[in-house]
Design a protein with these regions (language model features):
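Conserved nucleotide-sugar phosphate-binding/catalytic loop shared by glycosyltransferases and other
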Residues: 4-12, 34-80, 164, 237, ...
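Structural loop-to-beta junction motif characteristic of Rossmann-like glycosyltransferase folds
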Residues: 56, 120-121, 268-269, 286-294, ...
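Active-site-proximal region of nucleotide-activated glycan assembly enzymes
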Residues: 57, 116-183
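Glycosyltransferases and closely related glycan-assembly transferases
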Residues: 87-101, 108-123, 136-144
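Acidic donor-binding loop of glycosyltransferase active sites
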Residues: 97-99, 265-279, 287-288
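A short, well-ordered alpha-helix in the C-terminal region of glycosyltransferases
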Residues: 340-354
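C-terminal alpha-helical cap of glycosyltransferases
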Residues: 353-372
Length: 372
């Protein structure tokens, strides 16, 4: 190809920003196998490892986020921003991309800002129901904005805003409604009793202290009620929990869940944080879920995400401050009432958008002037 399609994608800091970026890249490459796709990430953040592992080159810039709890750490921020803007301009001048995509996180701000001032078409992918300040800042010059939630025209220019959903892993996007036979089979494959209810706990790869504390308080009672627990506690908590609790029938504690399709298929109910990517997966998988959003994220966006599903009958919402006292009984109540579980599953499936990556690339294709 004498003139390959060239794209730059920027986003990171958390998996919720990285995975959509990689999914978009994979969909572009599926359509245009010779496309040249490069990433820009924040130095020292997880995208600098995750993106190369997915097969794409990445260049780091020294950008950092604003520290609300340690203001003295912001003294070097202006210099980091200046250096980042300069590096982005150098990269874009050298690469000459036909379009630039931002999937959020503070690293996408300088990338989109510079691209827009260089006249390069930009697309924003906003995962949350409450837009972050970075995406708000650069939205006025964006050529397309793809959102996961409806009614985002209140904060973004309506003419270029499209609700597409968040990209999820293809295996999860393709999941069919789970039958009881499939659920029992998945429990057996995981080593659980197929006839007993299974509670899946997801605290994220880093873990969530409040969720772990609430589950530790509740799980003995759950198992006494003949329920089982697959507990993904995060890498920072797994050793301490194993040391403190040891082994017990009907309970498995692990840092990660490798096969999420199998775990979702086996689960009768899910307890989870409310990150945008996880919620999109829960909807595609048709899960009955209890969401405990982290209050320690920018603009409290997880609470907005959780409430968006809760208000549409697609999930339950428990504030973190109430998790320790409310989680155990809420799980018990719903496991005892299959019709309530099925209502949540139906509500989640109604919000699923399994074709998000494809829809985003459809909009992306309208931006560039490139021809093969």
């Amino acid at each position: 190809m004498p003139n390959p399609l060239r794209l730059v994608i920027s986003g990171g800091g958390t998996g919720g920003h990285i995975f959509p970026a990689v999914s978009i890249a994979q969909e572009v490459q599926r359509r245009y196998p010779e496309a040249e796709i490069r990433f820009i990430g924040a130095q020292g953040r997880m995208e600098m490892e995750r993106v190369p592992a997915a097969g794409y080159p990445i260049s780091g810039i020294p950008i950092a986020g604003f520290q609300r709890k340690a203001l003295h750490k912001n003294l070097s921020l202006p210099l980091k921003i200046w250096k980042s803007l300069r590096l982005v301009r150098q990269h874009l001048s050298a690469w000459q991309p036909h379009a630039v995509i931002g999937t959020g996180g503070y690293v996408s701000g300088p990338t989109l800002f510079v691209a827009q001032r260089m006249g390069i078409p930009t697309l924003i992918q906003e995962q949350n129901s409450f837009a972050g300040w970075t995406n708000r800042l650069v939205s006025r010059r964006a050529k397309a904005i793809c959102t996961a939630y409806p009614n985002m025209e209140a904060v973004f220019p309506a003419a270029v805003t499209h609700q597409t959903g968040n990209p999820v892993r293809p295996a999860i996007a393709q999941m069919l409604p789970i039958t009881e036979e499939a659920r029992r089979a998945a429990k057996t494959q995981l080593g659980f009793d197929p006839e007993r209810k299974l509670i899946l706990v997801l605290g994220g790869s880093q873990g969530a202290r409040a969720i772990n504390q609430a589950v530790e308080s509740a799980e003995t009672g759950w198992r006494s009620a003949d329920h089982q627990v697959l507990w993904q506690c995060g890498k920072f908590y797994v050793e301490a929990l194993h040391a403190r609790l040891g082994e017990a029938p009907g309970r498995r504690i692990q840092a990660f869940v490798d096969d999420m399709v199998q775990a979702y298929t086996a689960a009768d109910i899910v307890v989870s944080r409310a990150g945008a990517g996880t919620l999109s997966e829960l909807c595609c998988a048709g899960m009955a879920s209890i969401l405990i959003p982290s209050p320690n994220v920018a603009e409290d966006h997880q609470t907005h995400n959780a409430l968006s599903l809760h208000e549409r009958g697609a999930a339950l919402h428990i504030p973190e401050s109430q998790a320790f006292t409310s989680l155990a009984q809420t799980v018990e109540d719903y496991l005892a009432q299959p019709e309530k579980l099925e209502a949540l599953r139906s509500g989640a499936r109604a919000l699923a958008q399994p074709n998000a990556a494809s829809d985003i690339v459809d909009h992306l294709q309208t931006l560039w002037t490139w021809k093969a």
